[in-house]
């Protein structure tokens, strides 16, 4: 069993939940609601500040969320959670990341890429960022960036259908390093190769990044096979740390 989380404080989250309720067979049992192999949780407060203690009866969790972008990028995104940096302004804890969910996060993004045929939205990963704290593997699926997009029928269908029926593959799992927040080179490699992505360490987190945090990203990317590194989008000292860790742990190192 998996968990699907929506927040009443997030308009995009509730729009996606409404699409789910209108288009899928929701089962109820003793006050609990289920769709396929997901249990549905609806919380009152904003999910990024709502630390999750769900127990060990679930395989992973997906949070339905809005995406905000100062650049007004219209997007459908998937990303891991946690903070590599020294601040936690958007939930979670400083320098603390959750266990990622590479098979199903990648499967969800792969399905969105396959099913979305429009031109309005950019379908992409985001780097690991924001809370909450989770006690099981998890990822976010987001629609950005204004109410016009949050209520878009194609966006809701693409996102929710991909969460419920991800194109999940048993490909090798990698930690991605480098590039900007949307990791375009990582995304392009992902689209052309049989690979799953776990944590994504953006170049914006490289100034304060410590070696133990890179090892932590490996440990919190289940069955991690290696690193996928955007060479030009990675600080040289971070490249050196990644190389050293990959050598020490016998991990594959792919430079792009």
UniProtKB/Swiss-Prot annotation:
It comes from Thermoplasma volcanium (strain ATCC 51530 / DSM 4299 / JCM 9571 / NBRC 15438 / GSS1). One of its GO terms (molecular function) is zinc ion binding. The lineage of its organism: Archaea, Methanobacteriati, Thermoplasmatota, Thermoplasmata, Thermoplasmatales. Its cofactor is Zn(2+). It is an enzyme of class 3 (hydrolase). Keywords: Hydrolase, Metal-binding, Zinc. It holds the Pfam family tRNA_deacylase. This is D-aminoacyl-tRNA deacylase. D-aminoacyl-tRNA deacylase with broad substrate specificity. By recycling D-aminoacyl-tRNA to D-amino acids and free tRNA molecules, this enzyme counteracts the toxicity associated with the formation of D-aminoacyl-tRNA entities in vivo.
């Amino acid at each position: 069993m998996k968990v699907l989380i929506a927040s009443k404080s997030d308009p995009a989250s509730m729009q996606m939940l409404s699409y789910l309720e209108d288009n899928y067979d929701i089962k109820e049992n003793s006050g609990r609601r289920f769709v396929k192999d997901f249990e549905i949780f609806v919380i009152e407060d904003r999910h990024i500040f709502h630390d999750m203690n769900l127990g060990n009866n679930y395989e992973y969790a997906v949070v339905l969320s809005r995406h905000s972008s100062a650049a007004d990028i219209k997007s459908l995104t998937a990303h891991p959670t946690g903070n590599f940096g020294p601040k936690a302004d958007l939930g979670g804890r400083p320098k603390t990341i959750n266990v990622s969910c590479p098979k199903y996060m990648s499967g969800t993004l792969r399905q969105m890429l396959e099913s979305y045929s429009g031109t309005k939205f950019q379908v992409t990963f985001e780097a690991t960022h924001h809370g909450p704290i989770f006690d099981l593997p998890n990822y976010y699926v987001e629609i950005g960036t204004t109410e016009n997009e949050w209520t878009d029928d194609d966006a809701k269908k693409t996102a929710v259908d991909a969460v419920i029926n991800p194109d999940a593959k048993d490909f090798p799992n990698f930690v991605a390093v480098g590039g900007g927040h949307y990791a375009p080179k990582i995304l392009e490699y992902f689209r052309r190769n049989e690979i799953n992505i776990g944590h994504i360490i953006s170049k914006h987190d490289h100034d304060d990044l410590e070696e133990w945090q890179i090892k932590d990203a490996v440990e919190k990317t289940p069955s991690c096979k290696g690193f996928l590194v955007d060479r030009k989008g990675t600080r040289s000292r971070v490249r050196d740390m990644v190389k050293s860790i990959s050598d020490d742990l016998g991990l594959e190192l792919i430079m792009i």
